[in-house]
């Protein structure tokens, strides 16, 4: 299992990575502090494993783990190669899940690439870039399917209809994880494409420390 930490530059991705993995990756007040992805490993607590260890007392215990990847920040136009866009999207493609960090605090001393703090806008920027990249991948696949259909590849008709539906879904500004996809279609058509917006997402809100114990905000 591999989870990638993503978000705009300078929102706290490397800080979260260090907290989760007990690492010391560079974290600084400027965009693209992270260029090459940092990778750390986190053990997964499992009470069932603890119980088994108590019963059989093995010589060695190997817990389940998750690889955490601190990925370079994304900016508008990443799907077209802006910033570190191509590298960013390639790194996400290699993960199984996304941890999306959103900056939710004000601090004049910490720059924001968009000039202001707006977590909903920031979320939409990342979502939009991932959707555009998936749209590009599906359009390329559609072109290949059409070539097969032109030479009598009737077995591609079902895939063509399916891909068309996904393209229309993305054009509405929706991610593919919100599209009802059966396991057979996923395994047959989508798994080889490793589409970005199919990956499950956990949103992490980076808030002001003063608000941590404030239940009213």
Predicted regions and their residues:
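Short amphipathic alpha-helical patches
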Residues: 39-44, 75-76, 115, 122, ...
């Amino acid at each position: 299992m591999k989870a990638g930490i993503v978000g705009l530059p300078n929102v706290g991705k490397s800080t979260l990575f260090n907290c989760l993995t007990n690492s010391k990756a560079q974290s600084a007040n400027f965009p693209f502090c992270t260029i090459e992805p940092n990778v750390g490993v986190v053990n997964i607590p499992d009470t069932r494993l603890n119980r088994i260890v108590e019963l059989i007392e093995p010589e060695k215990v190997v817990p389940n783990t998750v690889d955490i990847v601190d990925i370079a920040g994304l900016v508008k136009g990443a799907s077209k190669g802006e910033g570190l866009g191509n590298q960013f999207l390639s790194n996400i493609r290699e993960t199984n899940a996304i941890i999306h960090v959103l900056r939710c605090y004000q601090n004049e001393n910490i720059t924001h690439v968009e000039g202001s703090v707006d977590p909903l806008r920031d979320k939409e920027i990342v979502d939009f870039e991932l959707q555009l990249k998936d749209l590009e991948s599906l359009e390329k696949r559609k072109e290949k399917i059409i070539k097969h259909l032109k030479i009598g590849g009737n077995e591609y008709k079902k895939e063509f209809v399916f891909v068309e539906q996904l393209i229309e879904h993305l054009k509405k500004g929706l991610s593919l994880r919100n599209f009802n996809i059966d396991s057979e279609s996923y395994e047959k058509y989508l798994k080889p494409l490793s589409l970005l917006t199919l990956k499950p997402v956990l949103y992490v809100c980076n808030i002001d420390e003063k608000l941590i114990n404030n239940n009213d905000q």
